[in-house]
């Protein structure tokens, strides 16, 4: 599992370049700040541990292929890391980045499989 510093570095290295409207100023080493769709700070911030604790609360993930989708979709699948089978999900509501989740694909697959067996 990622430690907080690694998660922070990963978000800075991967998330920010994929969507230029999320500026590096909004994704700092120590916290992720709530940002407008233009990438400016809104004044609110959460610690990485607070954000990551909500990883499994998202009810759906919608894949997005462009930055315009990113600021209009409430949930989207941002990136899948090859060998680690890890999903980075960012939740955007009304143009505000409100959550970044690190989710293991294996656990999602297992839950779906187990749910199918229960039916």
UniProtKB/Swiss-Prot annotation:
It is a multi-pass membrane protein. One of its GO terms (cellular component) is membrane. The keyword Membrane applies. It is found in: Membrane. Keywords: Membrane, Transmembrane, Transmembrane helix. The chain crosses the membrane at residues 61-80, 87-103. Almost completely overlaps PBP2. This is Putative uncharacterized protein YBR232C. It comes from Saccharomyces cerevisiae (strain ATCC 204508 / S288c) (Baker's yeast). The lineage of its organism: Eukaryota, Fungi, Dikarya, Ascomycota, Saccharomycotina.
């Amino acid at each position: 599992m990622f430690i907080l510093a690694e998660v922070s570095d990963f978000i800075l290295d991967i998330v920010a370049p994929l969507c230029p409207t999320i500026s590096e100023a909004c994704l700092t080493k120590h916290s992720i700040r709530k940002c407008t769709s233009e990438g400016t700070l809104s004044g609110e911030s959460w610690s990485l541990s607070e954000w990551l604790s909500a990883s499994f609360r998202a009810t759906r993930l919608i894949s997005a292929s462009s930055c315009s989708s990113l600021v209009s979709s409430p949930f989207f699948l941002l990136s899948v890391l090859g060998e680690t089978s890890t999903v980075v999900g960012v939740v955007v509501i009304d143009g505000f980045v409100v959550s970044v989740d690190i989710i293991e694909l294996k656990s999602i697959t297992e839950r779906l499989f187990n749910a199918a067996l229960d039916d």
